Amino acid sequence: MKPNYSVNTSPKRSDEPIWWGLFGAGGTWFAMLTPITVLVLGILVPLGVIDAEAMSYERVSAFATSIIGALFIIGTLALPMWHAMHRVHHGMHDLKFHTGVIGKVACYAFAGLITALAVIFIFMI
C-alpha cells in the first residue's frame, strides 16, 4: 500500500523563525527585566530608597560605556521594539489590514532602525 502523502523535496524556506526569535527575546526581556528597571529607576531612586549618588552622571556613564551596560541598554531599547513590531505586523493581519510585504518591511525596518540607533548612540557616549 502506497502512502497518500508526498514530500516536497524543495520546500520554500521561511524567514519567520528569525522574527519569532526576536519576538520571543523581546517579550521575555520586556516581561522580566523592564519591570525591575522601572522599579529601580522610576520608583526606588526618586523615593530615596536607593541613594541618588548611585545614579550620578559619572557612574551611569561608566556603566553605559562598559560592555555589560551597553548590551543592557541596547537590549532594553531594541528587543521590546522587535516584539512590538512583530505584534503590530501580525495584529494588522488579524484585523484584516493585509499590507503584504510592504507592511512586513515597514514594521521590521522600524525595529531595525531603533536597534541601529541604540547601537549608534551607545558608541557616541
UniProtKB/Swiss-Prot annotation:
UniProt-listed CDD domains: QFR_TypeD_subunitD (cd00547)
Superkingdom, taxonomy of origin: Bacteria
Subcellular localization, as worded in the UniProt entry: Cell inner membrane
Keywords, in A-Z order: Cell inner membrane, Cell membrane, Membrane, Transmembrane, Transmembrane helix
Record keyword Transport present: no
Record GO biological process: fumarate metabolic process
GO molecular function: succinate dehydrogenase activity
Annotated transmembrane regions: 30-50, 62-82, 105-125
Membrane topology: Multi-pass membrane protein
A cellular-component GO term for this protein: plasma membrane
Principal subcellular localisation of the protein: membrane
HAMAP family: Fumarate_red_D
Function: Anchors the catalytic components of the fumarate reductase complex to the cell membrane, binds quinones.
Subunit details: Part of an enzyme complex containing four subunits: a flavoprotein (FrdA), an iron-sulfur protein (FrdB), and two hydrophobic anchor proteins (FrdC and FrdD).
Record's protein name: Fumarate reductase subunit D
The organism of origin for this protein: Vibrio parahaemolyticus serotype O3:K6 (strain RIMD 2210633)
